[in-house]
Swiss-Prot record:
It is found in: Cytoplasm, Cytoskeleton, Microtubule organizing center, Centrosome; Cytoplasm, Cytoskeleton, Microtubule organizing center, Centrosome, Centriolar satellite. Involved in the recruitment of key centrosomal proteins to the centrosome. Provides centrosomal microtubule-nucleation activity on the gamma-tubulin ring complexes (gamma-TuRCs) and has critical roles in forming a focused bipolar spindle, which is needed for proper tension generation between sister chromatids. Required for localization of KIZ, AKAP9 and gamma-tubulin ring complexes (gamma-TuRCs). Involved in centriole duplication. Required for CDK5RAP22, CEP152, WDR62 and CEP63 centrosomal localization and promotes the centrosomal localization of CDK2. Belongs to the CEP72 family. LRR repeats lie at residues 29-50, 55-76, 77-98. Pfam families: LRR_9. It comes from Homo sapiens (Human). Interacts with KIZ, PCM1 and CDK5RAP2. GO terms for cellular component: centriolar satellite; centrosome; ciliary basal body; cytosol. Residues 152-161, 220-234, 366-377, 390-402 have a biased composition (Basic and acidic residues). InterPro entries: CEP72-like, Leu-rich_rpt, Leu-rich_rpt_typical-subtyp, LRR_dom_sf, U2A'_phosphoprotein32A_C. The lineage of its organism: Eukaryota, Metazoa, Chordata, Craniata, Vertebrata. The keyword Repeat applies. This is Centrosomal protein of 72 kDa.
Amino acid sequence: MARAGPRLVLSEEAVRAKSGLGPHRDLAELQSLSIPGTYQEKITHLGHSLMSLTGLKSLDLSRNSLVSLEGIQYLTALESLNLYYNCISSLAEVFRLHALTELVDVDFRLNPVVKVEPDYRLFVVHLLPKLQQLDDRPVRASERKASRLHFASEDSLDSKESVPASLKEGRPHHPRAKCTEALAKQSLVMDADDEAVLNLIAECEWDLGRPPGSTSFSQKGREADSRGSQESRHLLSPQLVQYQCGDSGKQGRETRRSSCRGCCLEKMPWSQLCGELPPLYGAEPEASRAPRPHTYFTPHPDSMDTEDSASSQKLDLSGEMVPGPLPAPGKCRKRRMPVGRFQTFSDQEGLGCPERTHGSSVPKESLSRQDSSESRNGRTLSQPEASETEEQRSRGVTDTREPSPGSHSALPGKKTALQAALLETLLDLVDRSWGGCRSLHSNEAFLAQARHILSSVEEFTAAQDSSAMVGEDVGSLALESKSLQSRLAEQQQQHAREMSEVTAELHHTHKELDDLRQHLDKSLEENSRLKSLLLSMKKEVKSADTAATLNLQIAGLQTSVKRLCGEIVELKQHLEHYDKIQELTQMLQESHSSLVSTNEHLLQELSQVRAQHRAEVEQMHWSYQELKKTMALFPHSSASHGGCQAC
């Protein structure tokens, strides 16, 4: 590769010298420029020398030592660029050609970037859409398609990985999506604690109501439940995540709730809550009396939410009390345990002893969660079981909630009075409507009144939720308004600073303009003075040179007279020569006439000689014919005479 020697920046004077343009011609007229490197001088930087070459279409900078292409972006009309045997080593310098959209032919051969960058050719093809030839090789359609696919995939990956901070700040964050993202980032693979829970269930033979061996059941149950509560965040299904995240107005509350999900589940033996289930409606099928696994609930599952949701507390009444669609995910949120893990009570044990359930320490929300979880898991109860479940649900709902000391102080008196009145109304309704013989599912009067109570509760909770959401929105808007005001103040300060700078610069520009005007006036005055001086000097020169011009005219006339005299002499000589030629012509004419007469005489003599010769020839022909006739008369005599001589 060409070595980069001492720094040599191309200058506009060198461009003019190489192109042959005069100092007063515009560089924009130049269309072709060739500045190849030599052994003495090799250009390393372009500088701002090409700024005025806006009409240049062909540029040859081969065999130089260019390490940077800064300054080439001014050649917007360039079509051919030759950078053969330079020192361009990175794609960042090649990227400076992106402004030259008219490039058709580019040559980067013997540059380090060709050998160092594996995607160099695809990069250049993608960078220049009109490129037809690269490094003395034509650009094929397959290469253009490959470059488009290659760099389009990289752009999509970069856009996914690097989102601008302004977009991240300006984009609204939905709390449910935020909660889902936070849970999705956590591992879903079982760790040692999950394996311990599964081993405990296996040792109990899938019945947590039976202690595994000689180990204390209560101690192991607490350990397993504690581990399960700590690890349940990793086992949440997407549907459960959506239910737990809640609506967009409760983002802060749900964030604090997720931090409290590590609380331990309290194991409560069912024998303390109720006794044996008395048989109803005679003997039940074996399948309905089969024991089911127990469920354990926390004493106060929602106590952690009361400090930030006191204005939006609502009684969690299960949607299964009345026929109809399930409540919205935002309203089902409080019927789930904070840790998101459910276990199932035995149907017979869970439906027994409603009187003891009424006075137990199990909160109404836990029983409500149990019923909602059983309905979501698809369990179908028989008519007696449904009746008892309805009774248990009703009595569980009427239980007075015992919040923690921290949350008890946060509950407003109006909400407590409303809850007490609602519970009292439900108790009276259950006492009036249910006699223990029939299911409340078929009691239309009870269902109508229960629906009325539930609708009033839902309206109240909806109003509370909307007020809380509006309050939170107002707070967020106030914070946003403060931030916008502070930003506006900063922008105003910055604008004021910029305006002061611009004003100062404008004042300085006006001052410079005044100076330039004064200088222009002085220059115009000096120009007019010089013009008047030039006119006066011309007049003086004309008056002083009059005599000299006359003398010059006389000398010129004299020389012309002499020249004419010489011409006259020459003409006289030519005339004498003409006379001599005329005499010679007459002599030649006379000799010609004599020659003609001699020629005629000779022609006459020749004709006479020809006639005589013709007569002689005819005489010879006649003599020859006579001789032949004579010889023809004596052939035999001559032959016999010849034979005798032979004998």
